[in-house]
From Swiss-Prot:
One or more lysine residues are methylated. SUPFAM superfamilies: Ribosomal L11/L12e N-terminal domain, Ribosomal protein L11, C-terminal domain. Keywords: Methylation, Ribonucleoprotein, Ribosomal protein, RNA-binding, rRNA-binding. GO terms for cellular component: cytosolic large ribosomal subunit. This is Large ribosomal subunit protein uL11. CDD domains: Ribosomal_L11. It comes from Rhodococcus erythropolis (strain PR4 / NBRC 100887). Pfam families: Ribosomal_L11, Ribosomal_L11_N. InterPro entries: Ribosomal_uL11 (IPR000911), Ribosomal_uL11_bac-typ (IPR006519), Ribosomal_uL11_C (IPR020783), Ribosomal_uL11_C_sf (IPR036769), Ribosomal_uL11_CS (IPR020785), Ribosomal_uL11_N (IPR020784), Ribosomal_uL11_N_sf (IPR036796). GO terms for biological process: translation. GO terms for molecular function: large ribosomal subunit rRNA binding; structural constituent of ribosome. Forms part of the ribosomal stalk which helps the ribosome interact with GTP-bound translation factors.
Length: 144
């Protein structure tokens, strides 16, 4: 007989700084209510994201009924990557009136390549259009 498949008890989605997960909120309470060993997750996450320090890395944690877990790392949010590329701290308060920065189409394509696996697009050009739309809604102009 094949081994029994674990039954999923919950799915937790978090955005945590790479290599900086600790039991303090938001990580502790989110995992605690599902009965997951918080320190075990923090150590595993920090080890997995060590190379991406400085970025916010979203994570999807699958918690099973026997209180074990596994997690899938996603790519950093497009907005964070755009802010980094543009060299600004935050987007515009009124994006269609005040522009805060600008990025080149090459930078947008680079971000699209990074995000390609998480985006709902068939090729890099479509992914770049999605990223350009995000930039526009943040008050960042795309040149080229």
């Amino acid at each position: 007989m094949p081994p029994k498949k674990k039954k999923l008890a919950g799915l937790i989605k978090l955005q945590i700084q790479a290599g900086q997960a600790n039991p303090a909120p938001p990580v502790g309470p989110a995992l605690g209510q599902h009965g997951v060993n918080i320190m075990e997750f923090c150590k595993a996450y920090n080890a997995a994201t060590e190379s991406q320090r400085g970025n916010v890395v979203p994570v999807e944690i699958s918690v099973y009924e026997d209180r074990t877990f596994d997690f899938k790392l996603k790519t950093p949010p497009a907005a964070k990557l755009l802010l980094k590329a543009a060299g600004v701290a935050k987007g515009s308060g009124e994006p269609h009136k005040t522009k805060v920065a600008s990025v080149t189409m090459d930078q947008v394509r680079e971000i699209a390549k990074t995000k390609a696996e998480d985006l709902n697009a068939n090729d890099i050009e479509q992914a770049a259009k999605i990223i350009a739309g995000t930039a526009r809604s943040m008050g960042i102009t795309v040149q080229g």
